[in-house]
Amino acid sequence: MRAAGQLLRACSQTWKSVRMASTGVERRKPLENKVALVTASTDGIGLAIARRLAQDGAHVVVSSRKQENVDRTVATLQGEGLSVTGTVCHVGKAEDRERLVAMAVNLHGGVDILVSNAAVNPFFGNIIDATEEVWDKILHVNVKATVLMTKAVVPEMEKRGGGSVLIVSSVGAYHPFPNLGPYNVSKTALLGLTKNLAVELAPRNIRVNCLAPGLIKTNFSQVLWMDKARKEYMKESLRIRRLGNPEDCAGIVSFLCSEDASYITGETVVVGGGTASRL
């Protein structure tokens, strides 16, 4: 009888766990009370990441170059019961980077997580035709500003005993997208930046990892998929024969920023449907 009772209790507990997992009741929050900054987070991949980090318990500060985008996103995510605030931030401007960090510190006491997602691409064509102005803009925002944004949060992370930086690169770093040469080059640079920062920041208990999304269906990438013939050609190169969704990137970012990934640093994870991804 005693054994039967123990078995019944075990079955009951197992069923309770399954039911909680399927309904979302008491969902585990691996980022509980962490403070996360996500740049370029009012649309596409950045928005999906911001939402997931908040769902996993983080206090998230979103940002965009336009106030109306920030206001809309904050209202939407707060309406979902998430702890989200936001501010305007052009990552290429020092005063904007400082304001973003200051908001997190003033509202939540510090910074634990940085997701560096901001990027630009003002050029489509042969790489040899890209002007010096194009190169300067792309490298300034996509690479230099990523370094400076990281530099801005490191002192705050140190005060809290460490942190996690997640840099968003692209599968174009490995397998160049056609007609996006300067953009591809900037994203390849981020792979090296991730490795260097990981080595230098490890003694401060700050981990640095990288996400390389493949062809994800966003407004930013529409030049690659709006044309039906090009879209089908791109899909043929994938093992998983579909375009990715922003949400496909969000879970892995949350994992890399959590304690579950505490022994992972300097790595790049490709979310690309099987796209070739080796330098």
Curated annotation (Swiss-Prot):
The keyword Transferase does not apply. Its EC number is 1.1.1.184, 1.1.1.300. It holds the Pfam family adh_short_C2. The record marks F177, L180 as: Responsible for the stereoselective reduction of 3-ketosteroids into 3alpha-hydroxysteroids and benzil into S-benzoin. GO terms for molecular function: 3-beta-hydroxysteroid 3-dehydrogenase (NADP+) activity; all-trans-retinol dehydrogenase (NADP+) activity; carbonyl reductase (NADPH) activity; identical protein binding. Changing F177S: Change in stereoselective activity by the reduction of 3-ketosteroids and benzil into 3beta-hydroxysteroid and R-benzoin, respectively. Substrate binds at S170. CDD domains: CR_SDR_c. NADP(+) binds at residues 37-61, 187. The modification Phosphoserine is found at S221. NADPH-dependent oxidoreductase which catalyzes the reduction of a variety of compounds bearing carbonyl groups including ketosteroids, alpha-dicarbonyl compounds, aldehydes, aromatic ketones and quinones. Reduces all-trans-retinal and 9-cis retinal. Reduces 3-ketosteroids and benzil into 3alpha-hydroxysteroids and S-benzoin, respectively, in contrast to the stereoselectivity of primates DHRS4s which produce 3beta-hydroxysteroids and R-benzoin. In the reverse reaction, catalyzes the NADP-dependent oxidation of 3alpha-hydroxysteroids and alcohol, but with much lower efficiency. Homotetramer. This is Dehydrogenase/reductase SDR family member 4. The gene is DHRS4.
